[in-house]
């Protein structure tokens, strides 16, 4: 009887260990007054999609991390979005650079209006680098899901095409910047934006899954 009880306990421990998340995602909290907290349902939905379709093991709930925090190193992938001003202190610049050059990955999603604020701040992080547009044949567009034309357009604002830019440090893509796309909006709960279709939302989630798969395998 004692032996059976011991075996049962071991089995329960093994089963519970399978539910321990391997990874976590975080949204970046920054200073400057911009709405860093936007797209509230985006990451939880992306996490669920990746766990279901890529068989990843992300913690279901996303977390929040400040740019200058040591906690940033707990996440293989961090997400920054917003419409307005962004300011990185010198300590935050150093911390973010250390994170990115040490294996971390930053996805910046322009929620329309972020561009003029985020570019100068990222220039402080990598003064020696320029954002380069990733061509449609870049591997990030051809992971589990194929996007032969590159970054998909999710929301229309002013007729410009969607563009995916990258910062490449010593041959490794460390930051992916989605511009004129609103990818994160597409990850949000269906119905958040009345004009969105299920098709456009699925397209956004598939592109997000490609991004996560690329980050975890590059």
Predicted features and spans:
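Positively charged n-region of N-terminal signal peptides that target proteins for export
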Residues: 1-7
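Surface-exposed patches in mature extracellular/periplasmic domains of secreted proteins
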Residues: 57-65, 108-111, 129-137
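Bacterial N-terminal signal peptides
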Residues: 7-16
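Alpha-helical scaffolding within the catalytic cores
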Residues: 60-67, 89-95, 159-163
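An acidic, glycine-rich "communication" segment
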Residues: 24, 32-33, 39-42, 115-191, ...
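Aromatic-Pro/Gly-enriched surface loop or interdomain linker
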Residues: 18-77, 81-84, 182-183, 187-218
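Short alpha-beta junction capping motif
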Residues: 25, 77-116
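Loop/turn elements at helix/coil->beta-strand transitions in domains of secreted/extracellular proteins
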Residues: 21-23, 73-77, 101-105, 129, ...
